[in-house]
Every structure is written in C-alpha cells, then in structure tokens.
C-alpha cells in the first residue's frame, strides 16, 4: 500500500493537471483520453471477469444469469458514471475560467447531490429488482441467479457513486492518471476475489457480485484518501459545504443528460433483453458473451467522449470556440482509426474472445455469438463519430440535443426488436445496435453545426460561465435550423 501511495503522489503532482486551453490539440486529447480509456476498460473488467469466471467455473446457466442481469446493472453504472461525468463538466468549466471559489462550492454541492442519488438508487434497486426481472420475462432457470447478482450490486451503489465522483472531480482538473491507478488496483483485487469466492468457496453468482462491491469500495476509499492529502483544489472550507441550489441545478443540467446518455444502452437493452429472454437461456448466454466486445468498444469511445467534453468545457470557459471545432475534427480522425482497428480485431479474433466465456463444447453458443460479433463490428466506425460529436455538444452546454438523440436510439432499438427479433429470432439481435448507431449519428451530424454556432453566439453575448441552454434550443432548431 505504501508503494501505491508513493506512485499516486508522483502521478498527482501539479504538472499532471492538464490545461486543455493551450498546447497541441491531439497530444492533449490523447494524453487525457488514454488513462480514462484504460480506466474504463478496467471498470468494465469487473463485469467481464464476473461473466468469464461464472461462465467457465459454474456453467452456461450462471453465464446466462449474469448476462440477464447485465442491462439492469449497466443501467446502475451508466446512471452514476454519467451523472458524475456531467458534474465534472461544471467543475471543469469553473476551473477553466479560473473561478476557484465557485469551483469549490460546485465540488461540495456535487458531493452532497451524488450521495443522495446513490442512496436513492440503493433503495429503489433493492425494492424493485425481482419485479423488474420478472417484467422482462427472465427465464425461470436463471431468474434467481440474475436477481441475486443485481441486488448485491445495487446494495453497493453508494461505493460506486463515491468512486466515480471522486475520479471525475480529479479528471475535471486534467488529472486522469491517479484515478486510473486506484481503479487498476481495485480491478486486480476483483479478479482475485472472484476466483476465491466462485471456485474454492463455491458462492456462485453471489460471490462474483460481492467481489465487485468490495473492490469498488476499496477503490473509493483509496481515491478519497489521496484527494484529502494531495489535491489542493478539493481542500474545502466549512462554508463551501453550504447547499447551493443554483450549482445543483447546473450539475443536473449537465449530469442528467450524460446520465441519460450513459444509461441509454441499458434502457434500450432492457427492451432487447425482454425479447432475448423469450428465446431461451442458450441464446442469452451467446449474446452475453458476444456483446462484451461491443461493451469494450463503448468504453473506448466513452474515453474519447469524456476527453472531448472536458476539452470543450475548458475551452468554452476560456472563450476558444475555434479550438473546440479543431479538437472535434482531430478527435474524429483518431476515433475512426481506433474503431477500424477494433473492427479488424473482432473479425479476426472473435472466436478466441468468445472462448473466454464459454467452453469449446458449447458449439451452438459459439456459432451464434460469432454471427452476432461479425455483424455488429462492421459499423464500429459510425459509433466512434457519434461519441465525439455528442460529447462535444455536452461540453459546450448543448445537452438537450444529445438527450433528443438518445430518445431516437431507444425508439430505433424497440422497432428493430419487434420487427426482427420476434420474427427471425437471434439473428435479429445483430442488427439492433448498428441500426441505433446509424440513426443517432445522422441526427448528431445534422445538429452539430447549428449548435456550435449557437454556442459561439452565446459566448459573444455573455460570459460563458453564466448560461447553459435548455430545451428551448431544440424547439428553435426544429423551427428553422437558425441558431
């Protein structure tokens, strides 16, 4: 632990806080995004290790149970990650504008707000968990396992909320390396606890869930201890802890759309999961394994999205709209290249990826999973463009548009589910995500230019820190694309 603290101190020196309003754009974005990307992948490692351990150590039914629980648990994680990411945009904006007093009040108010949200999520999850799984027609042979796994994760929601808020506060200052370090430590601990609880102790899916919660809690404690000693921006006075309704509203204006966006996958996948459950536990297992590749791509793109939103927020605070536009162009090129590489990996090595979760004797599950992976991976490039544009709009305060686009994703996935999955079976699952990516990316592309012009006009009219637009801009956009 002493070595970890020493390394954290080195990573957290003031030079590690990134001022994204100056310097090379690509270098700045990549330096900021890479630690977040690795962190996102390690965060996803929690669920992937749970899935792999129960799949290979317990059996296909346990794999299907964790898979059936995945949309519900991802809804929890997406809500908390999105909300805390949105709060970090507010903090980054005041950091970029040099308003230290308001920045500290924003940190304190955000902590109170996310704590209340974490408690509410825990209570709601504990009360509604079984009813939700029954509502989406979870097969009887995996129902108890899915409920048990999800309920334990809901009980650990406060720890998850605490870690993600602490990490995103540091990221708002440009320090993404220290949160990554603590997340890696906790992820490796999760691997060890998973192996211990599932194999020697035989706790099954419950053991995998308990390992995840304990690991998240340790990650939160490590991060908080480091911040208390080494991050001067969070040394708050008692007066900073006074509830500020205006700042809470700002947090919600950015946090709710990002939470909604981060939860969209889970919300729309709940619709898809209901149809998938009707196909039986074998198809649930195939989808659970194959869709992990999609999830990894989402996490990589989310890292670029977080970097772009922070880049846009800091530069909006300093009045540099031109730099934001150039950053979006360059980041788009980077994500296209990265997504092309991920597509090649899925096409060439998909079978080896599937074998992490199921044995070679499960030939039917392997075949279905490979068909799914080879179909969806073709359009990963579209997904990358989508994330860059959407998060750039959030970074400059145009959060209503991403929410509108998110609703289109839910509608598209629901349509594909009822038009294809219920008619042609598992093959229809492979078209649901690509259809969402295409429709939402078209909408993002249409909205980007007028929304950036609106941000520039608002910047000229008033200080950037004073105004965040609302849904009236959506109406104005519909009336004539005149913003």
Q: How would you name each of these model-derived features?
A:
Residues 1-33, 91-158, 200-256, 312-379, ...:
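Short alpha-helical transmembrane segments in multi-pass integral membrane proteins
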Residues 31-50, 152, 163, 186, ...:
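Transmembrane helical elements of multi-pass membrane transporters/channels
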Residues 75-78, 122, 190-194, 220-224, ...:
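Hydrophobic transmembrane alpha-helices of multi-pass small-molecule transporters
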Residues 84, 152-171, 179-187, 208-223, ...:
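Short runs within selected transmembrane alpha-helices of multi-pass transporters and secretion channels
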């Amino acid at each position: 632990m002493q070595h970890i603290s020493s390394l954290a101190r080195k990573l957290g020196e003031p030079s590690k806080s990134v001022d994204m309003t100056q310097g090379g754009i690509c270098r700045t974005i990549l330096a900021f995004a890479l630690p977040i990307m690795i962190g996102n992948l390690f965060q996803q490692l929690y669920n992937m290790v749970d899935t792999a351990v129960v799949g290979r150590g317990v059996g296909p039914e346990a794999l299907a149970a964790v898979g059936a629980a995945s949309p519900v648990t991802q809804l929890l994680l997406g809500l908390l990650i999105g909300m805390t990411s949105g709060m970090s945009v507010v903090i980054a904006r005041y950091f970029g504008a040099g308003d230290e007093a308001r920045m500290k009040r924003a940190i304190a108010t955000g902590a109170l707000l996310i704590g209340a949200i974490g408690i509410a999520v825990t209570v709601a999850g504990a009360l509604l968990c079984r009813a939700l799984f029954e509502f989406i027609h979870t097969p009887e042979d995996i129902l108890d396992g899915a409920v048990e796994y999800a309920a334990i994760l809901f009980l650990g929601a406060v720890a998850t909320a605490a870690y993600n808020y602490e990490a995103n506060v540091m990221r708002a200052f440009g320090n993404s390396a220290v949160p990554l370090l603590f997340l890696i430590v906790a992820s490796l601990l999760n691997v060890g606890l998973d192996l211990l609880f599932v194999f020697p102790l035989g706790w099954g899916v419950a053991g995998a869930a308990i390992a995840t919660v304990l690991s998240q809690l340790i990650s939160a404690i490590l991060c908080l201890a480091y911040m208390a000693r080494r991050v001067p921006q969070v040394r708050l006075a008692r007066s900073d802890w006074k509830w500020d309704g205006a700042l809470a509203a700002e947090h919600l204006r950015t946090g709710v759309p990002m939470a909604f966006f981060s939860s969209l996958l889970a919300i729309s996948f709940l619709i898809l999961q209901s149809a998938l459950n009707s196909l039986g536990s074998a198809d649930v297992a195939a989808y659970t394994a194959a869709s992990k590749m999609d999830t990894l791509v989402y996490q990589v793109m989310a890292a670029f999205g977080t970097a772009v939103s922070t880049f846009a927020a800091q530069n909006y605070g300093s009045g540099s709209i031109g730099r934001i536009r150039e950053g979006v162009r360059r980041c788009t090129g980077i994500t296209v290249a990265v997504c092309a590489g991920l597509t090649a990996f899925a096409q060439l090595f998909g079978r080896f990826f599937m074998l992490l979760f199921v044995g070679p004797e499960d030939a039917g599950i392997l075949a279905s999973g490979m068909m799914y992976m080879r179909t969806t991976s073709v359009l990963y490039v579209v997904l990358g463009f989508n994330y860059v544009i959407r998060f750039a709009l959030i970074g400059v305060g145009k959060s209503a548009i991403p929410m509108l686009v998110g609703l289109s994703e839910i509608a598209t996935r629901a349509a594909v589910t009822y038009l294809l999955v219920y008619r042609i079976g598992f093959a229809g699952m492979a078209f649901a995500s690509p259809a969402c990516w295409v429709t939402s990316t078209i909408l993002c592309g249409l909205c980007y230019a007028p929304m950036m012009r609106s941000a520039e006009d608002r910047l000229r009219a008033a200080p950037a820190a004073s105004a965040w637009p609302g849904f009236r801009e959506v109406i104005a956009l519909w009336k004539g694309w005149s913003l």
